Amino acid sequence: MDTTTAAPQPDHGPLRVVVGCDDAGLDYKEALKRDLAADPRVAEVWDVGVGTGEHVAYPHVAVEAARRVAEGRADRALLVCGTGLGVAISANKVPGIRAVTAHDSYSVRRSVLSNNAQVLCFGQRVIGLELARTLVDEWLGQRFDERSASAEKVAAIGGYERS
C-alpha cells in the first residue's frame, strides 16, 4: 500500500488526537476533549478551536485539524459542527485525509477497519452526547490492518488524489 498520502497510524500505543469544532459543536467538543484527555489510549489531545465566544467558520478549523493528521503531527482528528457534514467535507479537501460523518457504531467501526478514516465527525444537533461518547470510545479501540482486504481499496482512493 502507498503510504505517501497520509502519515501512517501506529498499530499499537496511545493516539495523538486533535479536536476542533465551530460554535455549533462547542459543547460536545469540550466534553469529548475531556474524555479523550482522561483515556489511556490517548497520548495527547490538541484543540484547534473554537473556544467560547469565538466564531470561526468550520472549514478553517476542519482543515487545520486535517493538516495536522496529514503531516503526521496527530494520528486522528475528532470534529464537531451542527451536522458533522461541513467539517467532513472540509477535512476531505486535505490530501491523504479520509474523514467521515458517522452517528452509529457500525459506521464508526467500519470507517477505520474498512476505510482507514483518520477523522471522525459528529453533528451536535444530530446525536446525543452520551451516544457521541460511546462512539468515540469505540473509535479509539479500532486500528486499520494494512494487510486486510481493504488495504488495496484504501490505496486506490489515495491513487485518485494523484491523478
PLM regions and their residue ranges:
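Mid-chain, well-packed structural core segment of small domains
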Residues: 79-125
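A short beta-strand-loop structural module common to alpha/beta enzyme folds
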Residues: 43-55
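Short, solvent-exposed amphipathic alpha-helices that sit
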Residues: 27-38
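Short, high-confidence coil segments that cap the C-terminus of an alpha-helix
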Residues: 42, 73-75, 116
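Short, structured active-site "lid" loops
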Residues: 60-79, 83
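Residues that form or flank phosphate/diphosphate-binding pockets in enzymes
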Residues: 27-28, 56, 86, 130
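Short active-site oxyanion
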Residues: 16-17, 74-77, 96-98
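C-terminal binding/interaction regions
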Residues: 2-6, 10-13, 18-27, 105-163
